Design a protein with these regions (language model features):
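Catalytic and substrate-binding clefts that recognize carbohydrates or anionic sugar/phosphate headgroups
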Residues: 1-120
């Protein structure tokens, strides 16, 4: 099932080509006072995605910046690589939901995936 959530006045990026009506409430994620979104990660939760980003296939335990940059020196110390693919697949752990999140935003997107807090 695909659900669409719209915040503010988004730019038409045409990255979603099928008409999907906006849903009312955002499942799984919690809106934080600072404008960010969070998800409670179980100890065995795994987070996949983000395209060309440093580190291994499980993105948990690090912070990332989705920003298309033409930087030739790639390494573990970089927060962002060339391609920004704002799609996450979150396996919540034993007995919890598996779901995906696609962020359709043309600017920088900052991710803290269990880096500051291992459980968020």
């Amino acid at each position: 099932m695909i659900q669409r959530f719209t915040f503010g006045c988004p730019l038409p990026t045409e990255s979603v080509v099928l008409p999907v009506e906006p849903a009312a409430a955002v499942p799984y994620l919690t809106a934080e006072p600072d404008g960010s979104w969070s998800f409670s990660l179980a100890e065995d939760a795994v987070v996949y995605g983000l395209g060309e980003m440093p580190r291994g296939i499980n993105k948990r335990g690090w912070h990332y910046v989705a920003d298309n940059t033409d930087e030739s020196r790639h390494g573990e110390n970089r927060l962002s690589y060339y391609g920004a693919h704002n799609f996450l697949l979150i396996d919540g752990g034993a007995g919890r939901s598996v779901f995906g999140v696609f962020v359709d935003f043309p600017g920088k997107v900052f991710y803290d995936i269990g880096y500051t807090r291992h459980d968020r």
